[in-house]
Amino acid sequence: MMIKLGIVMDPISSINIKKDSSFAMMLEAQRRGWEIHYMEMNDLHLDQGVAIADTKVVQLKEDPNGWYEFTSEQTIELSELDAVLMRKDPPFDTEYIYATYILERAEEQGTLIVNKPQSLRDCNEKLFTAWFPELTPTTIVTRKAEKIKAFRQEHGDIILKPLDGMGGASIFRVKENDPNVSVIIETLTNHGQNYAMAQTFVPDISNGDKRILVVDGEPMPYCLARIPAKGETRGNLAAGGSGEPRPLSETDLKIANAVAPTLKEKGLIFVGLDVIGDKLTEINVTSPTCIREIEAAFDISITGKLMDAIERRLQAQA
């Protein structure tokens, strides 16, 4: 049977096809002869409780001058699609949450949503690590400046971050005698109105912040180590880091295997774990990336494994 696959993403016209994981996923689906329905967030609607979408059937090619062509436009019930990839980048704001409710209505009518809408809401990318405290750096989450200051007093060298950033935005390293600590805390907590996370600094960041991909509970054997630019503490590619594909170390695999069963159970089919040294720092569930860089360096089809997982789940549902 021909699978109809929907994808909700940021505008396809502005992606970098060399690096875009959503593009890689669509290429693999197209290779399998699936029909791909492209959507942006504003194409999703509810009508009397029924999830509706304005979709464009898209064809793709690996051509930096023109990588997509829309072949038809239609308004359909989302439940007409076999599966939908939710690949919208953060911010994880109320609009994003509303979109997950629309997708959940389609899920209730039998459409497979990757990742599961309820789990997208439940598993904040920074906070979800709290369910695995034995794997993470020492961590607190608070709005109170005095608690963060006491944490810094105790640990000396710490990282402060908001709970809703992506690409390394607003991540601060605060050392023992940093004169800016108060203003950093005020900025991050919005004067005590917002929660922020404080973690002990993991010195291994100079060796890279590793992105480990997990597909339907199976850790991929290779990761992308994102090496910080000189003088930086953030490895994120968006913050100027450079990517170095590598095989997983034993420790990487141990961490991934510890988290993977929970991910699978929660319907989190495609997830990116961030690991620094031997510590888990983030669990990315919204729109993890780094497929292209890993596939270019090693003989592996991560997108192939993802589409296999989708096929398996669809067969199990049938």
Swiss-Prot record:
This is Glutathione synthetase. GO terms for cellular component: cytoplasm. Binds 1 Mg(2+) or Mn(2+) ion per subunit. It catalyses: gamma-L-glutamyl-L-cysteine + glycine + ATP = glutathione + ADP + phosphate + H(+). Belongs to the prokaryotic GSH synthase family. HAMAP family: GSH_S. Pathway: Sulfur metabolism; glutathione biosynthesis; glutathione from L-cysteine and L-glutamate: step 2/2. Its EC number is 6.3.2.3. It comes from the Bacteria. It holds the Pfam family GSH-S_ATP. Mg(2+) binds at E282, N284. The gene is gshB. Its cofactor is Mg(2+); Mn(2+). Residues 125-311 form the ATP-grasp domain. GO terms for molecular function: ATP binding; glutathione synthase activity; metal ion binding. ATP binds at residues 151-208. Keywords: ATP-binding, Glutathione biosynthesis, Ligase, Magnesium, Manganese, Metal-binding, Nucleotide-binding.
